[in-house]
């Protein structure tokens, strides 16, 4: 199917959500109101229900979007929980820490749920949700490891970068220790290499609180 064919199908509302995503488009939801019809993209409609998505790489762009949505939802209702749905392979440590700090900063509890994969900073943010409100779907995979980095240039510059990544490793391990209840030494050992877990294993480790198969 060509792009023009797909655009023709969109015009007749016959294209699937998957096909629209292939074009970089987002499905729309039409609601009836006293003033007539109003159309929302699906993510804006779910934002009204206090659902925020972190999907794909954690970078400055995705972090800015998540931070803005958390702050907006706090201003809308500071006493109602926010749900953060995560399907991410991880990414930038600084961008992830910006999201983490905002999750702790806002007044509402931030519930976290892993769907698909939460790896690296994705797993870190999953574990950073409100205690008792961190969950995963049954076939989710969760992976923790130490921060990755590289440096080039003069020896003194490489030394500076090495000190920084070692600091970040210690800081991330300290936070993971706080949110999981595991000793820092164990966190350091377990994150030395990629450490994959099932949902049930993540519960035992303290990264999440429960595995959810169906809505209650």
Curated annotation (Swiss-Prot):
An example Gene Ontology biological process: protein quality control for misfolded or incompletely synthesized proteins
Swiss-Prot/TrEMBL catalytic activity: Hydrolysis of proteins to small peptides in the presence of ATP and magnesium. alpha-casein is the usual test substrate. In the absence of ATP, only oligopeptides shorter than five residues are hydrolyzed (such as succinyl-Leu-Tyr-|-NHMec, and Leu-Tyr-Leu-|-Tyr-Trp, in which cleavage of the -Tyr-|-Leu- and -Tyr-|-Trp bonds also occurs)
UniProt subcellular location: Cytoplasm
InterPro entries to which the protein is assigned, alphabetical: ClpP, ClpP/crotonase-like_dom_sf, ClpP/TepA, ClpP_His_AS, ClpP_Ser_AS
Cellular component per GO, a single term: endopeptidase Clp complex
GO molecular function, one term: ATPase binding
Function comment: Cleaves peptides in various proteins in a process that requires ATP hydrolysis. Has a chymotrypsin-like activity. Plays a major role in the degradation of misfolded proteins.
Quaternary structure annotation from Swiss-Prot or TrEMBL: Fourteen ClpP subunits assemble into 2 heptameric rings which stack back to back to give a disk-like structure with a central cavity, resembling the structure of eukaryotic proteasomes.
Protein's name according to its UniProt entry: ATP-dependent Clp protease proteolytic subunit
């Amino acid at each position: 199917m060509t792009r023009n064919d797909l655009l023709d199908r969109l015009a007749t509302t016959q294209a699937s959500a998957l096909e629209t995503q292939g074009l970089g488009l987002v499905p729309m939801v039409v609601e009836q109101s006293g003033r007539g019809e109003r159309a929302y993209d699906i993510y804006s409609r779910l934002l009204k229900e206090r659902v925020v998505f972190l999907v794909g790489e954690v970078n400055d762009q995705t972090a800015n979007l998540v931070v803005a949505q958390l702050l907006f939802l706090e201003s809308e209702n500071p006493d109602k929980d926010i749900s953060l749905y995560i399907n991410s392979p991880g990414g930038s440590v600084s961008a992830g820490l910006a999201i983490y700090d905002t999750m702790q900063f806002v007044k509402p509890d931030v519930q976290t749920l892993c769907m698909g994969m939460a790896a690296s900073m994705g797993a870190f943010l999953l574990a950073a949700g409100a205690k008792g409100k961190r969950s995963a779907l049954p076939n989710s995979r969760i992976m923790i490891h130490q921060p990755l980095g590289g440096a080039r240039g003069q020896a003194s510059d490489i030394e500076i970068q090495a000190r920084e990544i070692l600091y970040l490793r210690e800081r991330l391990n300290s936070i993971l220790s706080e949110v999981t209840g595991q000793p820092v030494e164990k966190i350091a050992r377990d994150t030395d290499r990629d450490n994959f877990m099932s949902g049930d294993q993540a519960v035992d480790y303290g990264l999440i609180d429960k595995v959810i198969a169906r809505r209650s």
